[in-house]
Regions:
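Loop-helix junctions at membrane interfaces
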Residues: 1-177
Length: 177
C-alpha cells in the first residue's frame, strides 16, 4: 500500500468511526442498533475484516465512554463486523455474504455472548442465554437490509469498485447475484 492509499484509508476509517458514533443513536433501543450494522457491513466490504473489526471496536468504545451505554456496544458489533468481512472475502465479493456474516456474527454469536458479559461483568440479573437474540437479530436484519440496498446500488453503478480501488484494498466484481 503506497503512502497515498494509506492516508486515504486512514481518513476513510476515521470518517466511518465518526459517522458510526454520530448515527448510532438513530433507531436505537437496548440491544438493537441497526445503524451500527450498516457501518460494520460497509466497512467489511470497503476495507476488509480487520478494519471492520477495528472500526466496530473504536465505535463501541467511544459510545461506551461518551454515551454511557453498556458493553453491548462491543459484544453486539465486533463479531459481526469481523465475520462480515471474512465471508465477503471468502465469497469473492458477494454482498449478501457480508450481510449474512453480520447476521450470524452479531445476531447469533454476539447476542449469546452478551449474556455472560451483562450478567457477570455488568451485574444484570434475570437474563437468559437467548435474551438478546431477538433484538440483535432484528437490528442486524434492519441494518443489513439498508447496507445491502446501498452497497448493491453502488456496485451496479461501479462506485463500489472505484472506492475499493482508491482505498487500495482487494476488490471484487460481482456477477449474477
Amino acid at each position: 500500500m503506497n503512502k497515498h492509499n494509506y492516508l486515504l484509508s486512514l481518513v476513510f476509517f476515521s470518517m466511518m468511526v465518526a459517522v458510526g458514533v454520530v448515527i448510532s443513536p438513530i433507531l436505537r433501543v437496548e440491544g438493537m442498533c441497526p445503524m451500527a450494522h450498516l457501518i460494520n457491513i460497509t466497512m467489511a466490504v470497503f476495507m476488509g475484516p480487520w478494519y471492520s473489526f477495528l472500526c466496530a471496536l473504536a465505535i463501541g468504545l467511544i459510545r461506551m465512554a461518551v454515551m454511557g451505554i453498556p458493553p453491548l456496544a462491543l459484544t453486539g458489533a465486533i463479531f459481526g463486523a469481523t465475520l462480515s468481512g471474512i465471508l465477503y472475502r471468502v465469497s469473492k465479493g458477494k454482498i449478501w455474504a457480508a450481510v449474512l456474516g453480520e447476521i450470524i456474527g452479531t445476531g447469533l454469536i454476539g447476542s449469546v455472548l452478551s449474556y455472560p458479559v451483562m450478567t457477570y461483568l455488568w451485574g444484570r440479573t434475570g437474563l437468559t442465554w437467548m435474551f438478546y437474540v431477538p433484538s440483535f437479530l432484528m437490528g442486524t436484519i434492519i441494518g443489513g437490509s439498508i447496507a445491502y440496498v446501498l452497497l448493491k446500488s453502488m456496485s451496479r453503478s461501479g462506485v463500489l469498485e472505484n472506492i475499493q480501488r482508491k482505498l487500495g484494498v482487494q476488490k471484487f466484481v460481482e456477477t449474477n447475484e
